[in-house]
Structure formats: structure tokens, C-alpha cells
């Protein structure tokens, strides 16, 4: 049945399905559903356009059958059925779907009523000028070219993209676990915004809104209010209210009015809207309408809604907005691939990413032109040298037996290089005349000037920006058109989003692969110590394990620190809300500038930055630093440096100091602890390295927790095998910073090693989570205070092979009636995730 040389590797079915689905998911995300930030195209769109370019279907060329285009695309670049490729081509030709169509279609390409296009054997197409701008300079080594799927041809991984196509035409797509919906914009306004960011990379959203007030949909319509636009531009997500453009006309008898719809909201099917209105008229929801007619023609849309005599057109219009798609919400989600990673991006970051791409294109184009110019200049140098010794050169060539012999002789006799010798041998006699010699000299001098300019461009960032600026201004001069969508500002829509957010206590969880979510704290019932807990995280979602859990309020500020010592700033409500078993969303979608290998180390929630005290940072090798919290009040989007990290070290904790009475406690993996006043560490600058906080016992030891404590507190110390204890802070004698410290808990096979420690009172609860997703919330009244060197008690029963990975203190909330105390028996329905 099997060959003797075959090797069969047994695999767990569940693990194989999980890994295979993850690979499939990433394939859909990267290779199918999401556009590239650089050229705004999905792979299928890019391949269709490239196949059309290979067929020389430029704007001035004759249209070719779509069947030919789809066949070539399928056979050469996109190994899928032509019936899958044809809809991609059709959409790029529909002027109600694309703000700037990339394909010039001839024939029936569908309609805004949802009519299907004709079969591809009947329709024809060619490229538009917009598509040509995307592919301009493709032959000048401006982008990477890779083999196609069967390595018989080559295709570009991205287009040079002379304009920001992603924001011009927008994009929509559904991947696995994520979706994109980017609105289109006006090219002229977008160029103005790009020029603004070229001149001032730190320009604010308000400054961008002054030159680009919002999306510009191909179907026109009206955008109501600016808050949805502002949210979209700031966070990458927003809800934009879009209405049809309509007006009221008086009928000829002057006793009745008609509502006339002339422009549709984006992505609204006109025939379905008419059907929707007609159904509501029959149901008496829109009883004031007597007739619905579609009078649209080649000159434009005209939907007529006749109003009954005596009815108010204003009331009917408001009911149309409420009950029909005359008003819709465009849910913007500016998700695209940036460096092959899906990211939700602000307008600033999207434009900046295109500028970054364009800079690289210009540098590569300049290097190509430089190499070409230097090669030609080298040949011309040979020509000029040949003209200076023409008679001897001709004599040498005539005396040679063949071309190869002549090449060798002139190289040896006159010192020409091989490329120069070959070029001289291919010269025609008329090129040796005096007039041609002058042309050669002139061309050589021009090339020297070009070479100097190209080298200057490659060494001067300012010149690269000037080239981008000049190219954009040229596009603006020839392609600036009036916007189709108008924006009406509604005072009711312009309000702070936090006014409608409840400031409730939430739990923030971070999975092993850095997926984040927030949950109301009330989803976890309190249990007595030793309980089995409830499922706080679903391992079947593919997250691997739970890395961390934090508590906060929805309106708090989050300072997010990474192991590289970088700090990012977020509001809690910006994180996605999920159920207990939900996986959440990638934290990378919310943080810009995350580098390979960079992981979350600590999250600190801050109410405000007024008189906020100090931030205390600690690394796993025992280095500590104190810095004013005010230094972190306005981090940049790509984060700011919080601590200079030594090689082999990493940041593990960040704490908030608010009073002089507070002390610092450092706990180590092998059960040691040190306590000292925070005044022992002087305030430092944000980028300083820090000082020694604790001396570790050996190379296996490391700092696992840094806490700020007061004298009247106790400390809960938790080991990874589910055991722990409470000890009084005063039991840990105060020492100088940098010492080895004292024993905090006995380390043995039963307890395992120290996971962490948190200062607590009887009014606090603790939330423990294991690597297999088990969660338990324990009231501190159920854990008695013990001596410093004791073993502790069981806090949670863990399944075999499981271990605690995270702990977080939950302050009591008297208003939360749903946080109940329960017994161990009440939690017997814990789901097994093994």
C-alpha cells in the first residue's frame, strides 16, 4: 500500500485542522480578500490589469473580448475559473462602483439596478488612463517581479501606483475573522491631502479635513455629519451616514408634490429601493405616497414618489430616511495589508504608507535610470576615444581576420573595455562624420548631467519628495474634478463619542498570539478559593494560550508597554468587546509600529495625567527606573521609548506611584522579594537605562512582578501550580535597592515557581487564568494571611498539564449586583478544552 521509502508522520486531527484552517485563513487574508495599502488592489484585480497590459490594451488601443482577457489571466497568472475572474473585471469597469474605473468596458456591464452583465464572450474592454498611472514605470525595476504560479511567466507583487488608488477607489472584502470597507475619495482632494503630509508629516486630522472633507462616492449622495468621517480618519473605523439626493417638485396641477430622487447612496440597488418603498406603501408605513415610478434614463437617475394631496412632503421624507435605504450607514473599516500584515489604519497612516511606497519606487526607478545612463556614458566614452584615433583604429580593424579578432586587437592596442569595443565594431560609417561626433559629445555631456542628478536624488530625501510633489501636481492639473458627494454638517452628530459610553468596569485579555478583547467584569462570578473556575477563554478559537489579563474602566487611558521598552497609548473603549469565549482581534490592529519579536509586557490604566505622579518600570534582569508619568501623556502613534533595554533583557512591569509613602516590591521567579522606598530611585529621563533594583540568585532567576505597596496592605503571592498565600507587607523587611532580598514563599514541586504577586485587601478579588483558558475569581476574604516563609494554600484546582499564566486584582464594585458569590459545586459545569 505504501512505498518502503515513505515516512508517515502521525498527527492529532484537531491540531492538524486548527493549523490547516489557520493557513487557509492567512491565505485568504493575504492573497485574496484584502487590498495592498500601496496600490489598493487585491491579487485578482492586479492580475487582470497586468494581463491586459501584456495584451497591450492601452486606452488608445482597440477593445478586446473579455473572454480573451479572462482566459489569459486564468492561464498565466490567476489559476481560477474564468467565471470567478470575470466579475472582478466587470466591477473595475462599473462607474457606479468605482470612483475612477480602471477598465473601459464596451457592452453590457450591468447596471445600478443590479442587472447582471452580458456573458464575457459578448463584452470587450481595455485599460483606462487611471490603470495606466498605476502601472507606469513597471518596466523600470520599480517593484519586485516574481514567478507566476507555475513559473512559466513573471508578475509584479505590487504596482508602482502613481496615485493613492486605495483611497481613491476604496475597497471592500471579507476575509476570515476580519473585513475591510474603505470609502472612495476625490482624487484632487486626496492629492491635496498627500501634498499636505509631504510638507508636514505631523499634520493633524483637522488639517487633513480642511483639504479633504470626506469620502466622495461615485453615486453622489449626501453625507450627514462629520463625526463619522472624523472617527474613520482618526481610528480607521467609523459609521458614515449617507443619504440619497432628493428634492421636492410641484405637480402641474399645483395641488400635489412629488419627491424626486436623483442620486443614490453608495452600494444601494435602485430597483430594490423602489421595491422596498412600494412594499412600505402597501403596508401603510408610507401611506402618504400615491405612486412610485422609475423615470431613469441615459441622462441619469430619476425616481418619482408622488405624494397624496394634503400630505406633508417633509414628514414623508423623514419616514423614508427612517424606514428605507434612502438613508444608509456606511460602516468604514480601513483595513488593508501593510507589509503583508492586516492593519486597521488611520487616514494619516494610509497616506503615509503610500508616500513611503512611492519613495521606494522613485529610488528604484532612479537607480535603474542611473545604471542605464552610466552604461550608455561608458559606451560614448569609447566612441569619443575612438574618434581621437580613428585612422589607427580603422587600420587595426581592417587588418583583423574576423569580428572576434578585431575586438581583441582594439582592446589590447587602444585600452577599450569589451562593451566599448563591441559598440565600436557595430558603428555605421556615417556616425564617424564630424556632425555625428558633435552629437556624441553633446549626448555624453547630457548624460553626465543626468548621472549627477540621479546620484543626488539617491542621496537627498528632499529631492525624492520634490519628485513626488511634482508628479502629484501634474496629476492635479490634468485630472482635478468636482466632488460628487456633498457633506451636510449636523450639530446632533458632532459630539464626543465618550458621552454615549458607559464608564463600566471591564476585563482586558491578551492571548498568546496577541489577540485582545474586553469583557464586562460581571461575566465572572466570585468563587471561594479551591474552586474549578469557569471558561474565561476558548482555546478552540486558535489563540494557543492566554498571556495576560487586566482590569480597567472603559473611559480609562491605557499605557501599553512592550518587552522592547516601547510605550503606546489607547482608550479602553477602543478595544473590541467580546464574549467570554470570544478570541478578540489582533492587538497589532490598534498599535502602529510594532516590530518583529515585539510583545506586550504591561498595561497600565490611568484615569488622567493631571498631577499623576511617577511611572516605575522593571525588567526581568532586575533593572528599574522611575520617570514622571506626564512624560507619557501624548505618545506618538508609533509609540515612544519608555526604557533603554540592554541586550538579553526585556521590560516586564510598569507601576504607578502616586504618594511618597508608597514602597517598591520586586518578586523573583525563585521566590525572593525585595522592598525599598521609591525615593531610593531618582527620577530619570524617558530614554534612560535605569539602575539595579534587585540582585538575582542565578541565571535561572528573573523578576516576575514589580508592585507598589503601602504598610497596611498584604501581598498575595501566586505560584504557577495553583498555590499561593497572603503575607503582610511589613513581614518583608525594608532593604536598599539592589539587594538579593528575603524569601517570599517556599519553592518546591507542589507549588512550582512564582507567577507573580499583587498587593490586596479583604475588599479585593483576584482573577486567575490558566494556559488552557480556565478562569477563577477569588475574594481575598477567603484567603487568610500567613507567614512569609510558608508554603501557602491551594487557590485553584488545575487540570493535569495546566498551569497558571496570569493574575489580576479586581477592585470591589458595590453597584455591580451581578457579581455573586458561589460555591465550588456551582461551577461543576466547567468546559474541558483539552
Swiss-Prot record:
Catalytic activity, EC: 5.6.2.2
- Extract the InterPro entries matched here: GyrA (IPR005743), GyrA/parC_rep (IPR006691), Gyrase/topoIV_suA_C (IPR035516), Topo_IIA-like_dom_sf (IPR013760), Topo_IIA_A/C_ab (IPR013758), Topo_IIA_A_a_sf (IPR013757), Topo_IIA_dom_A (IPR002205), Type_II_DNA_Topoisomerases (IPR050220)
Q: Give the residue ranges of motif GyrA-box.
A: 527-533
State the compartments where it is located. Cytoplasm
Gene Ontology cellular-component terms listed:
chromosome; cytoplasm; DNA topoisomerase type II (double strand cut, ATP-hydrolyzing) complex
| Domain of life, per lineage | Bacteria
Q: Can you tell me which family this protein belongs to?
A: Belongs to the type II topoisomerase GyrA/ParC subunit family.
UniProt-recorded name of the protein: DNA gyrase subunit A
The record's gene field reads gyrA
Amino acid at each position: 500500500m505504501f512505498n518502503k521509502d515513505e515516512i508517515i508522520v502521525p498527527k492529532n486531527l484537531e491540531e492538524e485542522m486548527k493549523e490547516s484552517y489557520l493557513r487557509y485563513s492567512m491565505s485568504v487574508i493575504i492573497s485574496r480578500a484584502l487590498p495592498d495599502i500601496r496600490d489598493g488592489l487585491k491579487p485578482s484585480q492586479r492580475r487582470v490589469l497586468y494581463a491586459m497590459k501584456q495584451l497591450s490594451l492601452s486606452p488608445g488601443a482597440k477593445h478586446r473580448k473579455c473572454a480573451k482577457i479572462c482566459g489569459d489571466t486564468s492561464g498565466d497568472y490567476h489559476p481560477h475559473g474564468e467565471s470567478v475572474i470575470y466579475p472582478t473585471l466587470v466591477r473595475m469597469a462599473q462607474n457606479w462602483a468605482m470612483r475612477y474605473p480602471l477598465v473601459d468596458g464596451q457592452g453590457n456591464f450591468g447596471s445600478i439596478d443590479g442587472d447582471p452583465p452580458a456573458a464575457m464572450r459578448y463584452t470587450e474592454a481595455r485599460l483606462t488612463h487611471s490603470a495606466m498611472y498605476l502601472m507606469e514605470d513597471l518596466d523600470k525595476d520599480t517593484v519586485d517581479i516574481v514567478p507566476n504560479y507555475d513559473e512559466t511567466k513573471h508578475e509584479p507583487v505590487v504596482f508602482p501606483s502613481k496615485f493613492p488608488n486605495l483611497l481613491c477607489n476604496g475597497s471592500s472584502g471579507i476575509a476570515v475573522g476580519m473585513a475591510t470597507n474603505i470609502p472612495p475619495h476625490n482624487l484632487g482632494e486626496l492629492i491635496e491631502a498627500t501634498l499636505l503630509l509631504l510638507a508636514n508629516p505631523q499634520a493633524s486630522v483637522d488639517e487633513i479635513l480642511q483639504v479633504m472633507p470626506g469620502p466622495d462616492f461615485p453615486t453622489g449622495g449626501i453625507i450627514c455629519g462629520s463625526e463619522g468621517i472624523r472617527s474613520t480618519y482618526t481610528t480607521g473605523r467609523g459609521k458614515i451616514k449617507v443619504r440619497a439626493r432628493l428634492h421636492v417638485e410641484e405637480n402641474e396641477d399645483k395641488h400635489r408634490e412629488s419627491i424626486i430622487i436623483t442620486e443614490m447612496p453608495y452600494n444601494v440597488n435602485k430597483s430594490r429601493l423602489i421595491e422596498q418603498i412600494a412594499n412600505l406603501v402597501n403596508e401603510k408605513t408610507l401611506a402618504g405616497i400615491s405612486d412610485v415610478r422609475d423615470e431613469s434614463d441615459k441622462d441619469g437617475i430619476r425616481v418619482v414618489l408622488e405624494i397624496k394631496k394634503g400630505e406633508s412632503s417633509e414628514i414623508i421624507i423623514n419616514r423614508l430616511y427612517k424606514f428605507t435605504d434612502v438613508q444608509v450607514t456606511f460602516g468604514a473599516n480601513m483595513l488593508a495589508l501593510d507589509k503583508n500584515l492586516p492593519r486597521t489604519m488611520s487616514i494619516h497612516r494610509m497616506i503615509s504608507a503610500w508616500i513611503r511606497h512611492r519613495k521606494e519606487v522613485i529610488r528604484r526607478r532612479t537607480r535603474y535610470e542611473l545604471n542605464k545612463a552610466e552604461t550608455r556614458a561608458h559606451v560614448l566614452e569609447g566612441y569619443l576615444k575612438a574618434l581621437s584615433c580613428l585612422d589607427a583604429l580603422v587600420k587595426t580593424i581592417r587588418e583583423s581576420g574576423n569580428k572576434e579578432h578585431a575586438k581583441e586587437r582594439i582592446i589590447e592596442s587602444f585600452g577599450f573595455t569589451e562593451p566599448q569595443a563591441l559598440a565600436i565594431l557595430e558603428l555605421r560609417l556615417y556616425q564617424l562624420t564630424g556632425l555625428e561626433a558633435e552629437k556624441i559629445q553633446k549626448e555624453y555631456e547630457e548624460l553626465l548631467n543626468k548621472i549627477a542628478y540621479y546620484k543626488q536624488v539617491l542621496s537627498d530625501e528632499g529631492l525624492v519628495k520634490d519628485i513626488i510633489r511634482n508628479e502629484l501636481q501634474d496629476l492635479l492639473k490634468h485630472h482635478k474634478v468636482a466632488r460628487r458627494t456633498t457633506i451636510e454638517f449636523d450639530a446632533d452628530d458632532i459630539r464626543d463619542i465618550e458621552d454615549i459610553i458607559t464608564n463600566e468596569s471591564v476585563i482586558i485579555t491578551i492571548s498568546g498570539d496577541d489577540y485582545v478583547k474586553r469583557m464586562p467584569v460581571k461575566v465572572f462570578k466570585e468563587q471561594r478559593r479551591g474552586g474549578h473556575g469557569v471558561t474565561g477563554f476558548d482555546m478552540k478559537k486558535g489563540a494557543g494560550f492566554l498571556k495576560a489579563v487586566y482590569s480597567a474602566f472603559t473611559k480609562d487611558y491605557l499605557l501599553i508597554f512592550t518587552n522592547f521598552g516601547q510605550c503606546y497609548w489607547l482608550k479602553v473603549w477602543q478595544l473590541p468587546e467580546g464574549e467570554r469565549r470570544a478570541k478578540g482581534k489582533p492587538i497589532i490592529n490598534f498599535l502602529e509600529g510594532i516590530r518583529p519579536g515585539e510583545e506586550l509586557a504591561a498595561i497600565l490604566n490611568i484615569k488622567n495625567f493631571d498631577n499623576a505622579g511617577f511611572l516605575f518600570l522593571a525588567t526581568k534582569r532586575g533593572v528599574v527606573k522611575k520617570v514622571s508619568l506626564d512624560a507619557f501623556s501624548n505618545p506618538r502613534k508609533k509609540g515612544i521609548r519608555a526604557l533603554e533595554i540592554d541586550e538579553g533583557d526585556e521590560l516586564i512591569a510598569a507601576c504607578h506611584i502616586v504618594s511618597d509613602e508608597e514602597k517598591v516590591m520586586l518578586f523573583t521567579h525563585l521566590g525572593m522579594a525585595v522592598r525599598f522606598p521609591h525615593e531610593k530611585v531618582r527620577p530619570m529621563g524617558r530614554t534612560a537605562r535605569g539602575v539595579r533594583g534587585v540582585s538575582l540568585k542565578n541565571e535561572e532567576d528573573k523578576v516576575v512582578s514589580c508592585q507598589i505597596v503601602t504598610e497596611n496592605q498584604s501581598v498575595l503571592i501566586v505560584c504557577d501550580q495553583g498555590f499561593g498565600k497572603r503575607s503582610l507587607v511589613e513581614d518583608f523587611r525594608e532593604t536598599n535597592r539592589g539587594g538579593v532580598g528575603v524569601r517570599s514563599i517556599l519553592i518546591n514541586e507542589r507549588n512550582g515557581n512564582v507567577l507573580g504577586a499583587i498587593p490586596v485587601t479583604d475588599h479585593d478579588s483576584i482573577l486567575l487564568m490558566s494556559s488552557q483558558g480556565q478562569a477563577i475569581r477569588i475574594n481575598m476574604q477567603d484567603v487568610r494571611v500567613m507567614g512569609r516563609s510558608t508554603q501557602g494554600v491551594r487557590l485553584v484546582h488545575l487540570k493535569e498539564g495546566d498551569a497558571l499564566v496570569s493574575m489580576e486584582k479586581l477592585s470591589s464594585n458595590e453597584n455591580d449586583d451581578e457579581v455573586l458569590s458561589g460555591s465550588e459545586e456551582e461551577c461543576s459545569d466547567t468546559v474541558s478544552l483539552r
